[in-house]
């Protein structure tokens, strides 16, 4: 027998054995991944039978698994490439405003380090990344100045790199931060002029990035923005009045309503612009992201059940009802009367089809106690501005089972807004900065519990199409500074080194287990990969 024939036979056998070995290795990996599921950390909250039932759930093929961030909390580079001061740049420079006296001038330096951070996302297996744009980086002086092409070029590069990684950008126009110029010039959200500025800004973003961005949200948590900025004064522009806070100026009863109204009108203007000039060609979607709290009646009494409804009206539906139905919630209209701004006929015209989706940021739940027909303790909330509701995390010293709030909130939005598309745009767990904690079991337990609740809502019919973990990295956490850590990756803020926590491995395994691609298909894919062993 010729040597060439012998070598050919040996090569064929080797190839066959190698192919079989790949299949066996794939089986072993799949088994190990299944054994390393989240059930070992959360078997105290549901039975083993229920866990197995949950594990059979597979998300739709186009479901978005991702992580979320915001410009001010991540980017740093606060005066780089033509950017000027934002409201948060100015606010964090005021003594006593931030818990540890810190700021976001560097943050996690995502502006320069995002390519490496995209590698981390790719390793996790996510297929989407929720980020926000810095308004002050694109329009340093609002509509009163030129477009900063340094900012445009940066975001163009970043969006292109995100897409090259196989990840879908999910972009928010503003996540609390605005050019400080607009605050100096006319008082930002307290002035109707802000609508023109926001529409101008949205137009530039749609024009420069919309050919590649298929998911837009106008605002992130405008309810938090106006409550903390204009009622308690703990966020910029730090306006309030007693008894809500001790600010140098402001009106905690009226100004939140005015700011909210101008935000709603700005949202409607941006959506109308996108619908009429961009959506048909760009084929994207546009929505809004809200902070949500599930309010559970503290008792079965009618008064407390109605209080829970009022709590939602004065927190969530305050913004969503005008956008969807063209009017403020009935509970707000009954209590606030003429203090509540009115919508004109022209406003209502643009409110039709004003949402393709609602983004749900869900972290917590509260008990709601009636203060309209009952006496509440002084200093415990429950004012007219809050709908005469006292919201508390505890009942008889015990905390509400918070993961239930995810399921309840998703079903509430589904029923109230007629099966609208939903994305869980933020969900995560913060821990005090007590050193390098890499075995973050509490975060794993939190995420797995909430994701189980999300699955249950989907089984009941909620049209949930994505989940974004907050967050990939530890970052600047607003007035808490760097005292709280939310990252699946620990960040050493002195060196910017990223180190994976247990939650990063857990989330990676969760995505692998639950995406629509079956494990058999995944194994076949690996069998065909000629570089499978070169790792």
UniProtKB/Swiss-Prot annotation:
According to the UniProt entry, its GO molecular function terms are: beta-glucosidase activity
Q: Which residues form the signal peptide?
A: 1-38
**EC identifiers of the protein:** 3.2.1.21
Entry keywords, A to Z: Disulfide bond, Glycoprotein, Glycosidase, Hydrolase, Signal
Active site: residue positions? 221, 426
- List glycan-bearing residues: 93, 246, 419, 432
Residues reported to bind a beta-D-glucoside? 73, 175, 220-221, 363, 426, 470, 477-478, 486
| Source domain of life | Eukaryota
Q: Name the chemical reaction catalysed here.
A: Hydrolysis of terminal, non-reducing beta-D-glucosyl residues with release of beta-D-glucose
InterPro entries cross-referenced by the UniProt entry:
Glyco_hydro_1 (IPR001360), Glyco_hydro_1_AS (IPR018120), Glyco_hydro_1_N_CS (IPR033132), Glycoside_hydrolase_SF (IPR017853)
- Glycoprotein listed as a keyword: yes
- A UniProt-annotated Pfam family: Glyco_hydro_1
Question: Tell me, what is an example of a GO biological process annotation in this record?
Answer: carbohydrate metabolic process
- Top EC class per UniProt? hydrolase
Question: What intrachain disulfides are recorded?
Answer: 240-247, 371-376
List the PANTHER family.
BETA-GLUCOSIDASE 47, GLYCOSYL HYDROLASE
Q: Which family does it belong to?
A: Belongs to the glycosyl hydrolase 1 family.
Report what the protein is called: Beta-glucosidase 47
């Amino acid at each position: 027998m010729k040597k060439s024939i012998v070598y050919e036979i040996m090569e064929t056998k080797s190839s066959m054995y190698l192919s079989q070995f790949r299949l066996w290795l794939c089986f072993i990996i799949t088994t190990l991944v299944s054994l390393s599921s989240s059930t070992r950390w959360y078997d105290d909250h549901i039975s083993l039978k229920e866990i197995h039932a949950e594990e059979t759930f597979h998300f739709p093929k186009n479901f978005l698994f991702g992580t979320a961030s915001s410009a001010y909390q991540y980017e740093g580079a606060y005066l780089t490439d033509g950017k000027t001061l934002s409201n948060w740049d100015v606010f964090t420079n005021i003594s006593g405003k931030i818990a540890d006296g810190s700021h976001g001038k560097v943050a996690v330096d995502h502006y320069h380090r995002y390519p490496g951070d995209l590698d981390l996302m790719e390793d996790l297996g996510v297929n989407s990344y929720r980020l926000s744009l810095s308004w002050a980086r694109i329009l340093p002086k609002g509509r009163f100045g030129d477009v900063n092409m340094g900012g445009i070029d940066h975001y163009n590069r970043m969006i292109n790199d995100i897409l090259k990684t196989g990840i879908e950008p999910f972009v928010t126009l503003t996540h609390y931060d605005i050019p400080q110029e607009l605050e100096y010039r006319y008082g930002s959200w307290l002035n109707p002029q802000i609508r023109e500025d926001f529409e101008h800004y949205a137009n530039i973003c749609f024009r420069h990035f919309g050919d590649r961005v298929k998911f837009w949200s106008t605002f992130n948590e405008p309810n938090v923005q106006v409550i903390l900025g204009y009622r308690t004064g703990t966020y910029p522009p730090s306006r309030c009045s007693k008894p809500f806070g001790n600010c140098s100026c402001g009106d905690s009863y009226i100004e939140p309503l005015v700011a909210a109204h101008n935000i709603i009108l700005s949202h409607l203007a941006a959506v109308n612009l996108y619908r009429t000039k961009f959506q048909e060609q760009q084929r994207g979607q546009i929505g809004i992201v809200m902070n949500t709290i599930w309010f559970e009646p503290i008792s079965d009494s009618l008064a407390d059940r109605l209080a829970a409804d009022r709590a939602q009206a004065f927190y969530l539906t305050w913004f969503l009802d005008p956008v969807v139905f063209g009017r403020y919630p009935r509970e707000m209209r009954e209590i606030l009367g003429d203090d509540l701004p009115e919508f004109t006929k022209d406003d209502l015209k643009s409110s039709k089809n004003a949402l393709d989706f609602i983004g749900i940021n869900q972290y917590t739940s509260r008990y709601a106690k009636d203060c309209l027909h009952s006496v509440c303790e002084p200093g415990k909330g429950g004012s007219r501005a809050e709908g005469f509701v006292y919201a508390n995390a505890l009942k008889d010293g015990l905390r509400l089972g918070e993961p239930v709030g995810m399921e309840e909130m998703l079903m509430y939005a589904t029923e109230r807004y007629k099966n609208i598309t939903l994305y869980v745009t933020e969900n995560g767990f913060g821990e005090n900065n007590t050193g390098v904690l890499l075995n973050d079991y509490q975060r794993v337990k939190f995420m797995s519990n909430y994701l189980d609740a999300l699955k249950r809502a989907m089984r009941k019919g909620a049209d949930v199409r994505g989940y974004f973990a907050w967050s990939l990295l530890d970052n600047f956490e607003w007035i808490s500074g760097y005292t709280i850590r939310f990252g699946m990756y620990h960040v050493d803020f002195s060196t910017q080194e990223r180190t994976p926590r247990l939650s990063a491995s857990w989330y990676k395994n969760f995505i692998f287990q639950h995406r629509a691609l079956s494990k058999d298909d995944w194994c076949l894919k690996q069998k065909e990969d000629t570089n499978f062993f070169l790792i």
